[in-house]
Structure formats: structure tokens, C-alpha cells
Amino acid sequence: MVSPSAKEVDMPIDGGYVGMVDREVFDEWLRARAERSGATRARGTFLRIDRDAEGDAIVQFEDKDTHQPVKVRTRMVLGADGARSEVARQAIEGGREVPFVYAYHEILRTPATAPAKYDGSRCDVYYQGELSPDFYAWIFPHGDTISAGAGTAHKGFSIRNAVGALRRSAGLGGAEVIRREGAPIPLKPLRRWDNGRDVLLCGDAAGVVAPASGEGIYYAMACGRMSARALDRCLRTGNAHALRAARREFMSAHGRVFWVLGLLQRFWYTNDKRRERFVKMCRDPDVQRLTWESYMHKRLVRRQPMAHVRIFFKDLAHLLGLAPT
């Protein structure tokens, strides 16, 4: 972690690891696995959901190869089409009201000779207002490639310039750029994931990306499994209320963590003075231990009560500005 004043805090992981996923490989692997399991795979762009005379859903999409519209009659629709989900916009109440952070990153070729500041076994997170006024910037290793990026909800902020500055600061200014990518990251789960009939959302479309960290892959996969169970129950029973179980199950498992992380982001990411204190606070062994235990197990750690008490008073000192920076 790097503070606004360039002070660095290492947060080693004890008893576990954080896996960095190559989405270009992983996403295709998931699609191929679904196909092997019996799914019919079609490539195209979702257009809309129509209704036939019986009221059943008719999904219409544009075929990628022919560019012609294709219609598919279906009993259920699962919208997993990202943070700006067109399925959510068309079919779900409140689906157009999703706050998000815009993320942009550049995939770089890992230099043959690594810069002094770069460690291929370490994720670097920059909490600096000049790189992101309300989120963070990052250098994430992916073996032969590196992800250098940043996120912000401020529309007037030049995120591309910020990533350029980040690369120069990390000694990666001359690294080869393989591709550039941008995508919205939802800030909180939608209030409704289903239309009460035959449409359900999951993943980024449902808003299940962790605040503060922006972690989404684990939560999307967990949400996908819960959504699949809800769809199966709905199909077997014919009761559309079963669709609500997906959101209820997810929020029961992860809602409290999301709430805490949301508070953390809204307070500590506000300005450089608070970011400086936040990074300093993360130097504390109690904070590091409980942070990693919560992160690795995806739940708030309830044991070690004295560690929580110590953190409470340390947090209070930082909140009141009594702790030295």
C-alpha cells in the first residue's frame, strides 16, 4: 500500500494467497465448461426481451457473425451482462439506478528486467488523490503481463493520464502496452434482482462487487451459484417468489461485509489526509491479521475480541486526528 506522501506499508499474507486471474483465459474456460456440460452457446449482443401471446419471454439478440436478429423462447432469463446491464434496465425495477466507479487499466508486457519498484509476487495499491480522487490505483502482476489501472466516479477526472503517471512512478513508463480496457464497477447491490416472474440478475449486473476493494470475480461466481439454485427452484415449483432467494441468500452471506466496506470507502477514500491515516493504520499487525482473515474467508472475523478492541481505539484516534501521521 502506498500513501499520498509515498510512504509504503507491506501487508504480507499469512497462511494463504491471493490468486490473480487472467480474464482472457478464465472467461473462455468458463464458457467452454458450460458448453461441455450441455449449454448451447451462441455469440451475439443482447437486444431486448419480448413477450409472445402466452406471455413467455422471447430473448432477441444480434448474431455476432451474421449481424441478424435471433429470437429464442425461454422460460427463464438470467442477466449476467455486466454493471450496465441491459437486462436490468429493461426488466428490473430500479435497474437503471446503479451507482458505479469507472475503472480503466492497461495490460503491459512484463519487462525482461523488472524495475526496482516492481515485485512480480506483490500487488501494489496506491491511495493517492492525484491518481484517483475517490478510489485507488493499482499495479497487479499476472506473470507475463501486468495490469496498471485506476478507478474513479468523478466524470471530469482524466483516468488515462492518471494511469500514465502511475506507470512512470512505478518504472513501467516504457513497458509495451498490449491492450487498454475500461469498464464500470458497481458500488452496491441492486435492491431488486428479479422481476417477480421470469427474469433474474447475477454478478456485476446485480451490483455484487465489494466496495473499497472492487473485488468482483469471487462474488460473481458465488452469486451465479445462488442464482442457479433459485432458478432451479422456480422451475421445479412454478413459484416465481423463489427467484427472490438469490438476493436474500447472497446478502445474508455477504451483506454485512459489503456494508462495512462501503463505510470504509466513503470515509477513508475522501481526501489525501484521510488516505494517509488509512495507510498508516494498515501498518498495525492487528489490522493486517483481521483484514486478511476476513478477506480470505469472506466474512467478518468474530473471534479475537481484544484485537477488535485495540483496533477500535486505534481507529478512534485516527478519526479524531489524535494519532500521528
Model-derived segments and their meaning:
Residues 1-33, 54:
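A conserved beta-strand/loop capping segment in the N-terminal third of enzymes
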Residues 4-5, 51-58, 72, 193-197, ...:
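A short, glycine/Asx- and small/polar-enriched loop/turn
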Residues 15-19, 93, 216-217:
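Short glycine-enriched, charge-decorated loop/helix-capping segments at active-site entrances
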Residues 27, 101, 160-163, 260-261, ...:
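A general structural signal for well-ordered alpha-helical segments in protein cores
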Residues 33-176, 186-193, 207:
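Predominantly flavin-linked oxidoreductase catalytic cores and closely associated redox partners
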Residues 146, 189-258:
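Conserved mid-domain beta->alpha element of the FAD-binding
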Residues 174-181, 240-243:
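Flexible, glycine/charged-enriched surface loops at secondary-structure junctions
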Residues 232-325:
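C-terminal helical "tail/cap" subdomain of flavin- and related membrane-associated enzymes
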